[in-house]
């Protein structure tokens, strides 16, 4: 994937429009409760300021009604936090599409919630052209919305004088390309989660590429059903057994493997007080629920991870929120942390597991995109990246 990079451009004296992802959670009083996305946007903004650009930043926040900015929709709290992180005032500009505001080189303003503009979500061409007219350089630094074709992620990239990837977006593209397009072998993928149905496309796409496909959570239970194992009252999708079998067949035909659990942790309910039992996968009773990998399985999978060249991780392998069902995910996380392989991880639950087991510094790259990360794994073209690719030459 070839795109122009912000750091390759001379932005001195230029008006730069940055589409960031500042969609952060807030409490009922409007206080930001978690600011990772704002922090992740700082390098591109700082680069432009340090190099004498006049900087405009915008983002979506929540799911507002187009044409209105309600009290829950405003980026005002984000402007305050951005100012604190940049150590300079950040003015919030409302009704900005037609221009009429001034930004000097070395200054930064925040343009109010872009999803409040009529036509944003439908990638309206007239809106995109008006926004493109505000700038000399358009920067997309919002990988989390790269799978959506909207006016600030796609349309503007077509019409701005120059369109490029920001520092965060560039790092995402480089890391994902390294993991999936030129991986060091063996390539090991870990796909956890409740349902095969929601990740079927990913599983089939990866089955054509990876050397080992580790499945966890409810997905693993469906694969166990496909392998003829009894799973008691475990979460699974019996209607997806044929699809699970197809994934295993694709892997087998390539000489690759889906290593299924040999022992599991079971209980009769999912709760913090549930009594956990470690048993062989062949001993699962009619009322048992499989809630985690057992220690033998975890050790076997940790060995696979230890010998990997590249690791792609999406989804925990057990109900890791409860300590007695966290062993599999914890051992997996530890194996990834100690592996020499290049590792990339993404998806909300995966990030929660990384935080819980304190391995953020030991994962090669942590993707900021939930849906965008999944669609990339599915092999789909992401509209925002496709728009930047189309502008690579001009």
UniProtKB/Swiss-Prot annotation:
GO BP terms, alphabetized = gluconeogenesis; glycolytic process
Q: Where is substrate bound in this sequence?
A: 21-23, 37, 60-63, 115, 148
Q: Which domain of life is it from?
A: Bacteria
Cited Gene3D superfamilies = Phosphoglycerate kinase, N-terminal domain (3.40.50.1260)
> Coiled-coil stretches, from where to where?
none
The enzyme's main class, written as a single word, is transferase
Report whether Cytoplasm shows up as a keyword of the record.
Answer: yes
In short, the EC number is 2.7.2.3
Q: Which residues bind ATP?
A: 199, 321, 347-350
Q: Which GO terms describe its cellular component?
A: cytosol
Q: Where in the cell is it found?
A: Cytoplasm
Q: Which reaction does it catalyse?
A: (2R)-3-phosphoglycerate + ATP = (2R)-3-phospho-glyceroyl phosphate + ADP
Its principal location? Answer: cytoplasm
| Record GO terms (molecular function) | ADP binding; ATP binding; phosphoglycerate kinase activity
Query: Could you confirm whether the keyword Transmembrane helix appears in this record?
Result: no
The alphabetized UniProt keywords are: ATP-binding, Cytoplasm, Glycolysis, Kinase, Nucleotide-binding, Transferase
Pathway it acts in? Answer: Carbohydrate degradation; glycolysis; pyruvate from D-glyceraldehyde 3-phosphate: step 2/5
Instruction: Name the family the entry cites.
Output: Belongs to the phosphoglycerate kinase family.
Subunit arrangement?
Answer: Monomer.
Name of the protein described by the UniProt record:
Phosphoglycerate kinase
- The encoding gene is pgk
């Amino acid at each position: 994937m070839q795109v122009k990079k912000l750091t390759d451009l001379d932005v001195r004296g230029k008006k730069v429009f940055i589409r960031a992802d500042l969609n952060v959670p807030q409490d009922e009083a409007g206080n930001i409760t978690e600011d990772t996305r704002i922090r992740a946007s700082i390098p591109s903004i700082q680069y432009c300021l340090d190099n004498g650009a006049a900087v405009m930043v915008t983002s979506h926040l929540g799911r507002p009604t187009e044409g209105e900015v309600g009290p829950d929709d405003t980026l005002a709290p984000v402007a305050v936090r951005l100012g604190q992180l940049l150590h300079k005032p950040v003015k919030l500009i409302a009704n900005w599409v037609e221009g009429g505001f001034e930004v000097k080189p070395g200054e930064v303003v925040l343009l109010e919630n872009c999803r409040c503009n009529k036509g944003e979500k439908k990638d309206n061409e007239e809106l995109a052209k008006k926004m493109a007219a505000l700038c000399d350089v358009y920067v997309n630094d919002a990988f989390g919305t790269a799978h959506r074709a909207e006016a600030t992620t796609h349309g503007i990239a077509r019409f701005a004088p120059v369109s490029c990837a920001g520092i965060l977006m560039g790092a995402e593209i480089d890391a994902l390309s390294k993991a999936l397009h030129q991986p060091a072998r063996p390539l090991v993928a870990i796909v956890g989660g409740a349902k095969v149905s929601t990740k079927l496309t990913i599983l089939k796409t990866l089955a054509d590429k990876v050397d080992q496909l580790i499945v966890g959570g409810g997905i693993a239970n469906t694969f166990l059903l496909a392998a003829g194992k009894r799973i008691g009252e475990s979460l699974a999708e019996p209607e997806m057994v044929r699809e699970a079998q197809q994934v295993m067949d694709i892997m087998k035909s390539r000489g690759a493997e889906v290593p299924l659990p040999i022992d599991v942790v079971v209980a009769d309910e999912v709760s913090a007080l549930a009594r956990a039992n470690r048993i062989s996968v062949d001993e699962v009773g009619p009322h048992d629920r499989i809630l985690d990998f057992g220690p033998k399985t975890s050790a076997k999978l940790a060995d696979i991870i230890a010998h990997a060249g590249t690791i792609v991780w999406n989804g925990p392998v057990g109900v890791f929120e409860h300590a007695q069902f966290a062993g599999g995910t914890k051992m997996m996380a530890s194996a990834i942390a100690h592996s020499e392989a290049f590792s990339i991880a993404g998806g909300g639950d995966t990030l929660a597991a990384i935080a819980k087991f304190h391995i953020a510094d030991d994962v090669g790259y942590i993707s900021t995109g939930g849906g965008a990360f999944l669609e990339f794994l599915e092999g789909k073209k992401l509209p925002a990246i496709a728009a930047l690719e189309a502008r690579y030459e001009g």
